[in-house]
UniProtKB/Swiss-Prot annotation:
It holds the Pfam family Intron_maturas2. Keywords: Chloroplast, mRNA processing, Plastid, RNA-binding, tRNA processing. The gene is matK. GO terms for biological process: mRNA processing; RNA splicing; tRNA processing. GO terms for molecular function: RNA binding. The keyword Transmembrane does not apply. This is Maturase K. The keyword Kinase does not apply. InterPro entries: Domain_X (IPR024937), Maturase_MatK (IPR002866), Maturase_MatK_N (IPR024942). Usually encoded in the trnK tRNA gene intron. Probably assists in splicing its own and other chloroplast group II introns. It is found in: Plastid, Chloroplast. It comes from Iris setosa (Hiougi-ayame). Belongs to the intron maturase 2 family. MatK subfamily. One of its GO terms (cellular component) is chloroplast.
Length: 526
């Protein structure tokens, strides 16, 4: 760390940052190795083996890769079989090295480009603690704002962010951020060489991303995608400038922890409210703006635009988005990916919630002197529900239940100690209760917790070679009750006047926490 600090201090006197030499420094790969070890705390993390190699990194291997990658005929060779691709036997040794080296280089490159933006690294050098306000920015804070603004809007438009994205476009976007030409040249050369056997896999699609990036090289993939997200935000700012003559009043750039970048823009205008909720490809970011007539939000690759105006205004916004994206990113964007719906009859998926406007009508008898008359009033309420179908799909992918929601055992956890199995299932339930505490109705959440509860019991019964009924009869049903009710006990302390709800109870209080800095893992996998 001292060597890295000395290099950065020497580099501050230069006009352009030169990051390429850092690829040959061994401590960069030590940082990447420590980051990979930290990934094991993820909920769905499962270690992957790289063809028998361990996860250690060394400077000699990094230098060897950089030399080998510039050699034309020493990379991967693939032949097409009738059913699948098979690697030539005498090239398998080279493939193993290439696969392993690619992980090292991608992690090292991700470390380099994150150095100027890393809040924790700067705080380490300056011996300062990270302000608590930076750690308490919650993605739940956007929902009270939406509840206050969306009640007076008419239409909502779902806009899918254009895809697929060619990697060359992402590299060109990085040129505006990083001025180190050798580093960018090496990144472009590395991407082209590693994916030259299948050019179709060189695209980012909404459902299936590049395997090498989405699995082994998550960090580099996130950074490339975040750079594209930043450019999309500039388009939103451009639309804001075209709709108002008021200048930008304030602009702040804040860096969130967990290596995700958050841009917070407060744009004050006369006829437009712009709320940009930046959710990176795997994690969250939050940005808000204030005004009085329309709201736009972007989350998980989808832009939600809700102006207070006519249907004609929505069509104009649709035309602007299509034109700007095609002109700015130089690829075709289909207009049918933009759907315009009436807000009063539409539910949109937003940050793990199904949000919609619920109209409540009431009749009041008004008495004035000797005359009386009835007054009908209609009030709007933002309803946030747990997306049960999406969560069941996530549990099915993670092998906790079937597609129809029938609980099953988790085979890969059956070899763990009983306490570890209960702790993992309990942590999932607590995280779900914590994240979806703002739901208007808890019945869907109870169903998800019930699936996890039975899946935990089936996993324990499978381990002990018994049935669920016999296992619970022997140990008691209270074995699985404690960690399922922990979140409810916390709520009973926060709201002492309310009735604390049990596993089968009902609780209609919505609570938005201020410590939620990431989207729940089950929501990410839906």
């Amino acid at each position: 760390m001292e060597e890295l600090q000395g290099y950065l201090e020497k580099d501050r006197s230069r006009q352009q940052p030169f990051l390429y030499p850092l690829l040959f420094q061994e401590y960069i790969y030590a940082l990447a190795h420590n980051h990979n070890r930290g990934l094991k705390g993820s909920l769905f993390y499962e270690p992957t083996e790289v063809f028998g190699y361990d996860s250690k990194s060394s400077l000699a291997l990094a230098k060897r890769l950089i030399i080998r990658i510039y050699q034309q005929n020493d990379f991967l060779s693939v032949v097409n079989d009738s059913n699948k691709n098979r690697f030539v036997s005498h090239h398998r040794y080279n493939f193993c090295y290439s696969h392993f080296y690619s992980q090292m280089i991608s992690e090292g490159f991700a470390i380099l480009v994150e150095i100027p933006f890393s809040l924790r690294l700067v705080s380490y050098f300056e011996k300062k603690e990270i302000p608590k306000s930076h750690n308490l920015r919650s993605i739940h804070s956007i929902f009270p704002f939406l509840e206050d603004k969306l009640l007076h809007l008419n239409y909502v438009s779902d806009i899918r962010i254009p895809h697929p994205i060619h990697m060359e476009i992402l590299v060109q976007i990085l040129q505006c951020w990083i001025q180190d030409v050798p580093l960018l040249h090496f990144l472009r050369f590395f991407l082209h060489k590693y994916h030259n056997w299948n050019w179709n896999s060189f695209l980012i699609t909404p459902k299936k991303s590049i395997y090498v990036f989405s699995k082994e090289n998550k960090r580099l993939f996130r950074f490339l995608y975040n750079s594209y997200v930043s450019e999309c935000e500039f388009l939103l700012v451009f639309l804001r400038k075209q709709s108002s003559y008021l200048r930008l009043t304030s602009f702040g750039l804040f860096l969130e922890r967990r290596h995700f970048y958050v841009k917070i823009k407060r744009l004050q205008m006369q006829h437009l409210i712009l709320i940009v909720v930046c959710r990176d490809y795997f994690q969250k970011a939050l940005x808000x703006x204030x005004x009085x007539x329309x709201x736009x939000x972007r989350c998980q690759g989808k832009v939600v635009l809700a102006p207070k105006g006519t249907h004609l205004l929505m069509k104009k916004c649709k035309y602007n988005f299509v034109t700007l994206w095609q002109y700015y990113f130089h690829f075709w964007y289909q207009s049918y990916r933009i759907h315009i719906n009436q807000l009063s009859n539409y539910s949109f998926y937003f940050l793990g919630y199904l949000s919609s406007l619920l109209k409540n009508s009431s009749t009041v008898r008004n008495q004035m002197l000797e005359n009386s008359f009835l007054v009908d009033t209609v009030t709007n309420k933002l309803e946030t529900l747990v997306p049960v179908i999406f969560l069941i799909g996530s549990l099915s992918k993670a092998q906790f239940c079937t597609v129809s929601g029938h609980p099953i055992s988790k085979p890969i956890w059956a070899d763990l100690p009983d306490s570890e199995i209960i702790e993992r299932f309990g942590r999932m339930c607590r995280n779900l209760s914590h994240y979806h505490s703002g739901s208007s109705k808890k019945q869907g959440l109870y169903r998800i917790k019930y699936i996890l509860r039975l899946s935990c019991a089936r996993t324990l019964a499978r381990k002990h070679k018994s049935t669920v009924r016999a296992f619970l009869r022997r140990l008691g049903s209270g074995l699985l009750e404690e960690f399922f009710t922990e979140e409810e006990q916390v709520l009973s302390l926060i709201l002492p006047k309310t009735i604390p709800f049990t596993f089968y109870g009902s609780h209609k209080e919505r609570i938005w926490y201020l410590d939620i800095i990431r989207i729940n893992d089950l929501v990410n996998h839906s």
